[in-house]
Amino acid sequence: MAVFKTTLWRLISGTLGIICLSLMATLGILLKNSFTKLSIEPAFTPGPNIELQKDSDCCSCQEKWVGYRCNCYFISSEQKTWNESRHLCASQKSSLLQLQNTDELDFMSSSQQFYWIGLSYSEEHTAWLWENGSALSQYLFPSFETFNPKNCIAYNPNGNALDESCEDKNRYICKQQLI
């Protein structure tokens, strides 16, 4: 009887061991596949929510541009200095992103990168101005008074604007107004 209990115990523990090993192998394969998928996906999603293009009822944007509320946005995948970014946008008949309201902040909220925006300090006006000369609205970035006037402004996914050296390289967003 003791031999039977020992044999039965070995059979049960062996079966459970094989099941555990199978589960661990399956878990390892699933984790490997999910990490591979996560590392590949960001390369194909450069920034803000591309679904916004479907909501654009009054504009037709060129290829690689995203439409949202009668504006087209180019979301760069390469990093440039602020001046290089500004010139590249101008060559596309657009300008660095100028945020008009919190809706555009929502448009940016799905991004996980830093982007140059078209905000710089005007020594002549002693104020932060958008590329078109309009003043920065204080409700967009409540802490804007702490920015260093010698720096340029990058936007981050948490809804904050940060001042960085204009020679640093960041991704950028160009905005083209259609109306």
Swiss-Prot record:
Keywords: Adaptive immunity, Cell membrane, Disulfide bond, Glycoprotein, Immunity, Innate immunity, Lectin, Membrane, Receptor, Signal-anchor, Transmembrane, Transmembrane helix. The keyword Repeat does not apply. Can form disulfide-bonded heterodimer with NKG2 family members KLRC1 and KLRC2. KLRD1-KLRC1 heterodimer interacts with peptide-bound MHC-E-B2M heterotrimeric complex. KLRD1 plays a prominent role in directly interacting with MHC-E. KLRD1-KLRC1 interacts with much higher affinity with peptide-bound MHC-E-B2M than KLRD1-KLRC2. Interacts with the adapter protein TYROBP/DAP12; this interaction is required for cell surface expression and cell activation. Natural killer cells. Disulfide bonds join C58-C70, C61-C72, C89-C174, C152-C166. One of its GO terms (cellular component) is plasma membrane. Residues 1-10 are cytoplasmic. Residues 68-175 form the C-type lectin domain. It comes from Pan troglodytes (Chimpanzee). It is a single-pass type II membrane protein. It is found in: Cell membrane. InterPro entries: C-type_lectin-like, C-type_lectin-like/link_sf, CTDL_fold, NKG2/CD94_NK_receptors, NKR-like_CTLD. Glycans are attached at N83, N132. PROSITE patterns: C_TYPE_LECTIN_2 (PS50041). The chain crosses the membrane at residues 11-31. Immune receptor involved in self-nonself discrimination. In complex with KLRC1 or KLRC2 on cytotoxic and regulatory lymphocyte subsets, recognizes non-classical major histocompatibility (MHC) class Ib molecule MHC-E loaded with self-peptides derived from the signal sequence of classical MHC class Ia and non-classical MHC class Ib molecules. Enables cytotoxic cells to monitor the expression of MHC class I molecules in healthy cells and to tolerate self. Primarily functions as a ligand binding subunit as it lacks the capacity to signal. KLRD1-KLRC1 acts as an immune inhibitory receptor. Key inhibitory receptor on natural killer (NK) cells that regulates their activation and effector functions. Dominantly counteracts T cell receptor signaling on a subset of memory/effector CD8-positive T cells as part of an antigen-driven response to avoid autoimmunity. On intraepithelial CD8-positive gamma-delta regulatory T cells triggers TGFB1 secretion, which in turn limits the cytotoxic programming of intraepithelial CD8-positive alpha-beta T cells, distinguishing harmless from pathogenic antigens. It holds the Pfam family Lectin_C. One of its GO terms (biological process) is adaptive immune response. This is Natural killer cells antigen CD94. The lineage of its organism: Eukaryota, Metazoa, Chordata, Craniata, Vertebrata. Residues 32-179 are extracellular. GO terms for molecular function: carbohydrate binding; HLA-E specific inhibitory MHC class Ib receptor activity; MHC class I protein complex binding; MHC class Ib protein binding, via antigen binding groove; protein antigen binding; transmembrane signaling receptor activity.
